[in-house]
């Protein structure tokens, strides 16, 4: 039989000094200081489109496909989620109309000079760019200039 001393208090919960609280699409997420927004969003199952981001590499932010909206003191602002670290109390939206429009615009620019010969391409259905165009693309391009052609 064990006895409990009523004078003992429960230990204080350990608080991680490197943790910050971020709200992503209305969900509160615990993230590490310095962690990029895109990595924190991945843990909430809020997929942010990307081409140049890989969790095991340094972020470069070249494709701009991972744009999200961060609500700040001066209102919402578009930021590149693979290059922007989380901050305590930050509010991030990944699926607003403005974000979707910006992501479509970036994808449209990536496709602007891309050859549109997907049926005969060597990648034939295994192309991340093609997958992104189908899932996050605008459907049609505003650019009608002639594309670059390469010898096969």
Describe each region flagged by the PLM:
Residues 1-21:
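Terminal leader/tail segments of proteins
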């Amino acid at each position: 039989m064990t006895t409990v001393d009523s004078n003992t208090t429960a230990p204080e919960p350990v608080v991680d000094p490197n943790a910050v609280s971020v709200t992503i699409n209305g969900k509160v997420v615990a993230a590490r200081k310095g962690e990029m927004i895109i990595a924190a969003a991945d843990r909430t199952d809020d997929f942010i489109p990307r081409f140049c981001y890989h969790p095991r590499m340094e972020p470069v932010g070249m494709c701009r496909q991972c744009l999200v909206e961060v609500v700040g003191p001066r209102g919402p602002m578009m930021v590149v989620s693979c290059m922007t670290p989380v901050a305590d109390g930050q509010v991030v939206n990944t699926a607003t109309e403005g974000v979707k429009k910006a992501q479509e615009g970036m994808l449209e620019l990536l496709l602007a000079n891309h050859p549109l010969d997907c049926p005969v391409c060597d990648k034939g259905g295994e192309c991340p760019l093609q997958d992104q165009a189908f899932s996050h693309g605008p459907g049609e391009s505003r650019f009608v200039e002639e594309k670059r052609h390469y010898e096969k």
